[in-house]
Amino acid sequence: MDRRDFLDLLAKGTSLGLLLKLAPLGMLEFVRAQSSATSFQKALLVDKAGNPFKLSTLKPHEPFVFAYPFAATPNILVNVDAELSPVEVKMPDGKNYRWPGGVGKGRNIVAYTSICPHAYSYAAPNLGAMGYYKPEGNRGPRMVCCAHLSSFDVTRGGEVRGGPAPHALAAVALEYDAAKDEAYAVGFLGNPQFDEFFRAQNQALRNLFRTTARAREEVSKATVIPYAEHTKVPTTCPVLG
């Protein structure tokens, strides 16, 4: 199936789940078909021992972190304990895109960049400005940046629910192998703003990685670790929206 066929079927309303089964390139082809998406080097998610990470081992609402596509750009991976369907995510520049929903056997697993699109605060190893907040009362699960209280709905493609963030949180595109219960990161949906992030965090990243080249090194395998092990000082703050 080529890109034109893929887009034609998507426009005709063919289910995304079926398309990803039909398309040989799966999620990677889906990313390339989006107007607001970026593909990067494909990276297998692995555990600390280097073995393929099994998505079914994720417990509900316990966040994990993996660096992708660069050594210095952490993402948050979490089981939200609910099946998530595709949604249309609106962008201020008009380059809206289709978020494919959750992955995994229960379609309940999502991954997003931890870099806030407002001022590029993130889940740094020394201070976790961006974190995951499990559902509470009538509020669903959120990712929140405690720097300026931007809140993002992880069940709806990372759309903004509160705070000054100008657009949705970029979602990691995960290609899931159901037979092996493994996943590959293949790119991002939305605008991850990596160039802006590296400029804003230049000195801090040099302190962590010694050189910009090391910070920007692309990963071929993405090691998944608990959020609590990645970030020495997590932050908590009110959840807006």
Locations of regions flagged by a protein language model:
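Hydrophobic membrane-targeting alpha-helices
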Residues: 18-26
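N-terminal pre-ligand scaffold of iron-sulfur
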Residues: 28-132, 176-241
